[in-house]
């Protein structure tokens, strides 16, 4: 009797592994089936979402600039762009436009060289800017706007005075605007070794007063950087300002004003490695807005002195500037472009917000002030 019982137990024990294997296989089959079903449902859900997604509008275009000057965008994250664009708590409203001025030298009379402007024409330009509702901004404000769409005046102007000048020059041409309107002027400072102690001290005083916001414009006033420039020349022009700005101005420059308008792929990449965040050319292409920079991809036979910058693919390091002598005539154009851009944005607002709600809201959160 005990022998039969033992035999039965042995047979039962032999069947246990088989039962476990069968059970495991069945469980795996169920898991695979469930996983496959979930994947099919996910694909179906994704397809359903994709089919309901509204197509985003193309980049704003305008006929008010040269057709070869094509608006370039630089914000790759669509969700972040839409949130920055429509967050009315902290963001500049669509159509906020910045006119960037390049001033070589203001002459009492008889401006004849490129970049020069007479004192009379300069005063007329500044008064027209103010009467048209423009306000001057500092480089740090411009950087916050152009990178993240942080609020600035809807019509802003960035006034860049190229080259080194003493206090008497700035007092004569800029102090009244600082005193009466609070307008700061950006100075493209050339960090030449032979700058006199007195010139340094005068500019340091104006920097800490707030009237002048110094940024880097290389070392040698005659340098024109390009892709053919030697590594040592590129390094000298870009590193030189970093060596002296901290000691004298108590800051690192945010921007590099390309000396004499010369730039290239290699100089731009080197500037980025040295932590420059903005670059300004001498190319006159139009105003700039958040995620909207007009640049050329090809050489324009009618403007051979404007090297194309679009293919460098770094719009923030190749920003255009209006020449001082042409600024007055362009003010209405800049204002009109801002109005066109605002109207275009409002026409497409609901489409962008619907896209954001479907694609972005779960990860990026609700856009403040929009239910």
Predicted region positions:
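N-terminal pro-sequences and low-complexity stem/linker regions of secreted or lumenal proteins
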Residues: 80, 119-122, 183-194
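C-terminal motif of bacterial Sec signal peptides marking the signal peptidase cleavage site
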Residues: 24-27
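Bacterial N-terminal signal peptides that target proteins for export
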Residues: 4-16
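Acidic (Asp/Glu)-rich catalytic clusters
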Residues: 173-182, 194-216, 272, 308-314
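Bacterial signal peptide processing site
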Residues: 29-31
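A structural motif
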Residues: 203-224, 233-240, 245
